[in-house]
């Protein structure tokens, strides 16, 4: 926490000097530049130029940070002033200023390039606990203020954009660090964090085993996996795409974990558990992965809440004074997983049959040229979204009890 307080004091002093608002304002005038998976691969190819990547990132990363900082500033005042949100904001400001220092430096200087990698590592480590810290800020705000439906909707809108922004900046930093760092710690068959020949079924099986181990530890039992794969693009061949295995693993682990929990709890009195089914299909345009369980499903009224950042079936975690903030219990598993899917123009949806089970479907682009970053931009449309006020519903809302027409007097 001492380090965090130092960062906050540093950011505050910069702000008082008038530097931070000017830099944030300057870079927020630019729109982020989304990259395709193919472009990210080109940045890391054998002929990759570190100077080109450096020149792009020293401009692009401040633009992405500044855009989301502008959105933080138009959140409700009581939320922005919570200690946790102030801490997150200070991290972003400090990181932006660290990156801006490279704007006047020459990409021809090898020491500058080396220092830039070190700075990216420092920024990435500084932002390690952004997700749970922002989540704690939301809890602090809700504990002290009444949140109306419109504000709640705006928070959902903001958090989707905030966390998508974080996924994107982390992706760019990881690519540069893994490719150009002196310590080659990445997988030699990968280009940065991207696998040009990602074995989708292998990732599915690995994510299942990780979730199964967790389920066995907690429940002392777990369902098996029934896997089906269909390659509609190249029949008979293994299913491979260009993708980030860690992103896919994150999504699948979350879905398998939920499916196993539902199955074990719903079928606790049965002699055996029905398997969790995974179906992987590669088409000409899309890769689709369906995870199906017989865990009893959820009612329709709850389905939409499952993607809300404020809904969780786990106990709310207790934050301590360390930076190792917990994430389980904040209700972020599914919404963050959906963002990972959407990041490269995919999606993640749930279809549940209450009393039977749930199908969770991940959609990904099959072509790397169509897998393009989905990025938030702060503009007039985004600003107007936060200014929306509550309006009367233009659909009739039924009362809890139907009107007893027999007691109504007929008009003469």
Curated annotation (Swiss-Prot):
Induction: Up-regulated by exercise, starvation, glucocorticoids, thyroid hormone and epinephrine. Down-regulated by insulin. Transmembrane segments: none annotated. It comes from the Eukaryota. Its EC number is 2.7.11.2. Residues 138-368 form the Histidine kinase domain. Signal peptide: none annotated. Pfam families: BCDHK_Adom3 (PF10436), HATPase_c (PF02518). Keywords: ATP-binding, Kinase, Mitochondrion, Nucleotide-binding, Transferase, Transit peptide. SUPFAM superfamilies: alpha-ketoacid dehydrogenase kinase, N-terminal domain, ATPase domain of HSP90 chaperone/DNA topoisomerase II/histidine kinase. It is found in: Mitochondrion matrix. GO terms for molecular function: ATP binding; protein kinase activity; pyruvate dehydrogenase (acetyl-transferring) kinase activity. One of its GO terms (biological process) is regulation of fatty acid biosynthetic process. The record marks 157, 161, 395 as: Interaction with the other subunit in the homodimer. Ubiquitous; highest levels of expression in heart and skeletal muscle. The keyword Chloroplast does not apply. One of its GO terms (cellular component) is mitochondrial matrix. ATP binds at residues 254-261, 293, 312-313, 329-334. It catalyses: L-seryl-[pyruvate dehydrogenase E1 alpha subunit] + ATP = O-phospho-L-seryl-[pyruvate dehydrogenase E1 alpha subunit] + ADP + H(+). PANTHER family: [PYRUVATE DEHYDROGENASE (ACETYL-TRANSFERRING)] KINASE ISOZYME 4, MITOCHONDRIAL (PTHR11947:SF22), PYRUVATE DEHYDROGENASE KINASE (PTHR11947). Belongs to the PDK/BCKDK protein kinase family. Homodimer. Interacts with the pyruvate dehydrogenase complex subunit DLAT, and is part of the multimeric pyruvate dehydrogenase complex that contains multiple copies of pyruvate dehydrogenase (E1), dihydrolipoamide acetyltransferase (DLAT, E2) and lipoamide dehydrogenase (DLD, E3). Kinase that plays a key role in regulation of glucose and fatty acid metabolism and homeostasis via phosphorylation of the pyruvate dehydrogenase subunits PDHA1 and PDHA2. This inhibits pyruvate dehydrogenase activity, and thereby regulates metabolite flux through the tricarboxylic acid cycle, down-regulates aerobic respiration and inhibits the formation of acetyl-coenzyme A from pyruvate. Inhibition of pyruvate dehydrogenase decreases glucose utilization and increases fat metabolism in response to prolonged fasting and starvation. This is [Pyruvate dehydrogenase (acetyl-transferring)] kinase isozyme 4, mitochondrial. It comes from Rattus norvegicus. The gene is Pdk4.
